[in-house]
Every structure is written in structure tokens, then in C-alpha cells.
Amino acid sequence: MDHGELFFHFELQNYEIRFKISKFVIVISKPIPMAKKYRFNEDWASVFVGLIIVVAIIVATIIPDIPKILPKFGPKEGWTGWTVLSTEVFTSGNSVRVLMTFLYFFFFAIVGSWLMGRKGKELLPAFPIVFILSMISQFIASAGLMKDLGLETVLFSLVIGLFVSNVIGTPKWLKEGIQSEFYIKIGLVMLGATILFSEIMKAGLFGVLQAVIIVLSVWYFAFWIAKKLKVDSELAAMLASAVSICGVSAAIATAGAIKGDSKKLSYVISLVLIVAIPMMIVMPLLSRWMGLTPEVTGAWIGGTIDTTGAVVAGGTIAGDIALKFSTIIKFSQNVLLGIAAFIISIYWTYRKSDNDPAEKPSLKLIWQRFPKFVLGFIATSIIFSFFINPETAVAAGKTIKSYQSLWFNLAFVCIGLETRFKDLVTLDRGRPAYAFLIAQAFNIILTLIVAYVLFGILWE
């Protein structure tokens, strides 16, 4: 084998995949259709693909000679002008990275399609278009202004998909290649790499205590108020998780756990990202006006604002100490994501059984309905928390987060392509939006009280 060459070979009966990277060249052998008895459902296929990608990234982290393929979109603070674009983004080397990234993701999308018993040819015209749209959304989100506003790429992915769907129209051949739920589940399996036990230790007793109190209290209140406003249970669960846990990721994980409607998911995420913008600006100003300590300010911001980018932006405005505490509290809530997804999955299985008395909630039924990608999420988290060198875990985790984000971007482009904007605006006559805003107001007040008691009175 040549130096710097990667070669992957998977074999099952009547099925073969060959994958080779050498000098930026990928070769995929022609597949033989998988025998029916070897087909996976979407959950297991996402676990398989997600874990293979995670293992590949760990290997690439340990072996430095393996080339990095993800494209660059400017410095961490975002691109601000043509000078940065011409020297860091619009370069021949970056063009090769974009091509390599496309081939890498296309390969795994096809692998997933084959594992589920499909031919994979439906992806050939559709996936390149979806990928290009996701790259455009990534480029826009990487602008300095968008970074300052804390706007995440998934918002632009959704908006671009909605634009194509509602202005141009999504052709049938493109719809046939849309796999939004599969891409989301792959991303969720990989998300486990960023949920580490060590983060709980960093937060300490008070950080974990605040996270548990807020998540439990706000989730219950948000679900209750949504039901009072006659929002359906599926949408209410997504709203409650988004408000109480960690915004976008929590909404996505909950949608996967309850097999929720992707249109409702996109609605919730739009609310989360839009509401986070004024909060990250107003909350630091309110903290100064009320004379809160930096510790209380950080705990309040981290426990209330629903997106990590907006938390960092709000914490930065409030000062270095507030930024540190807001980040720690946010990580504490993020850690609870896997536990929450597991509990919601079990609850939803029993709830379905209650609606259908003929089906008793046996262990077999629970297993059949349980979203298997949650197991992949938990497995990845355990591997990175306990079985990998901490330095390797941190380095690989950063790369995995970038790959996971791109899977989410692809998913939300797909969701936008199959959604009519009118359906989002008129969803339940605005009742979910009212429920979200009321729940967020409750979250702001309760978190302020808890943060003040823990970090203003008890904290030394």
C-alpha cells in the first residue's frame, strides 16, 4: 500500500463495497444489490454509517499523514471581505477539498441507501444538488456578520431549501433523492462524540444541579402550556425539548426519538434561532442593569439561550467570567441530551401503547419502536468519554462536530426542499409560537432565580 493511501473493503453475502483514497482519488466498485435478509432499517443503517465515520476520523486523528478534506470558509470569526475570500476560501486547494468532501459524503449516502435495500441510483442526480445548496448555506453562515449574530448554518440550509421549493419548485427527480431523516440520524450518532462525561465534572455540583432543575421544570411546563394551547403532542415534545435542553440539537434528537414530522421540526428550529438573536443582546444588558455578578450572569445566559453560538455571543458581551460560566452551564445541559432522548423514546413507546389498548407495552414492542440511533449516540459518547485518550478525543471530537454539522445541513436543505412555506407560517394558527414564547419567558424567570440562588448566594 502506498504511503498516505486509505483502502476500505466491506463484504456481505451478495454485497461488496470498495472504497479507496489515494492522492485525492476515490474509487467505488460497482455494487451487487444486497440480499433481502441483510437489509437494515433506517435506524440501524444510520448507526452503522455514523460509527464507521467516527472510527475513520479517530484513525485520521491518530495518523497525521492522512489528508484533511473538509473545506475552509474563512477564519473562526468569519470572513469579512474579498481579501479573506481570495486567500482562504476561493482557492484551488479549497476547491479540491470541496470535491473530496462531496465524494466522501456521497459515498456514505450511497452506502446507507444500499444497506436499506435501495439501489442508490436515486441519489445520483439529487445528492449533488443538495450538497451544493448546503455548501452555499455554509458559506453564508461563515460571514462575519452572521457569526456575530449567532446564526447557525442549519437556518440558512432550511431557508435555501424553502426558497427552491416555494419559488422555483422541487422537481420529482430531486424529491426521490431526499433522505432528510437518515442524514439527521447519522448526525445524531456522531453528536455523541461531543457529549463527554468530563464536561459534567467541569460543571461541578452547582452546574449539574442547575441543569437538572431547569431541564425537568421547563420541559414539563413547556409541554403543559403547549397542550393547553391545543398544540399536538408531537410538536409539543419538540418545543419542550428545544426550550429546556439545548435548542436545535435537542429538537432534532426528540424528533428522531418520536419519529416526528420534519416540517414541525423545521418550524421549531426556526423559532429557536430567531428568538435567540434578541436574547443574546438583551440579556447581558439586563444583567448589568440588575447588577448581577458575572457568575450569575453567565449561568443565566447559559441556562436560557437555546443555541451554543448565541450563548457564546451573549457571554462574550457580558465579559470573560460570564462567558466561562455560560459555556459550562450550556455544556451541562447538552450532556443531558442523550438521557433525555432515551427517556422520551421510552415514554413515547408507552404513550403509543396507551392509545392502542390492543398493543401491550411489552419489552419486545418497546425494542421494536425504540429509535436505534439513540444507541449509536450513547455508544459514541461512552467511547469518547472512557476509551479514548483525552487529547485524541478532543481533537477527533472537533473534526466529528464539523462532519456532524454538515450532515445536519444536508438534512435541512432536504427538509426545505419538501416543505411549503405556507405550511410553516400557518401551522396551527400560530399557537406553537405562542407556546414557545410563553415557555421561554418561564425559562428566563426560573433560570434567573435558580442561577441567583446557586451562583449568587451559595457559590464561593
What are these model-predicted stretches?
Residues 35-39, 44-90, 105-118, 123-178, ...:
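Structural signature of multi-pass alpha-helical membrane transport proteins
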Residues 43, 231-279, 295-319, 403, ...:
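Alpha-helical membrane segments and immediately flanking helix-loop junctions
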Residues 51-54, 127-139, 159, 182-195, ...:
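Small-residue-rich segments of transmembrane alpha-helices in multi-pass membrane proteins
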Residues 91-104, 147-160, 203-216, 241, ...:
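Structural signature of hydrophobic alpha-helical transmembrane segments
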Residues 94-98, 126-131, 135, 182-223, ...:
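Entry/N-cap segments of selected transmembrane alpha helices
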Residues 140-142, 146-252, 256-266, 280:
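Glycine- and small hydrophobic-enriched segments that form the cores of compact globular domains
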Residues 197-206, 287-295, 316-328, 452-460:
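Helix-coil boundary and interhelical linker segments in multi-pass alpha-helical membrane proteins
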Residues 319-356:
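Oxyanion-binding "anion nests"
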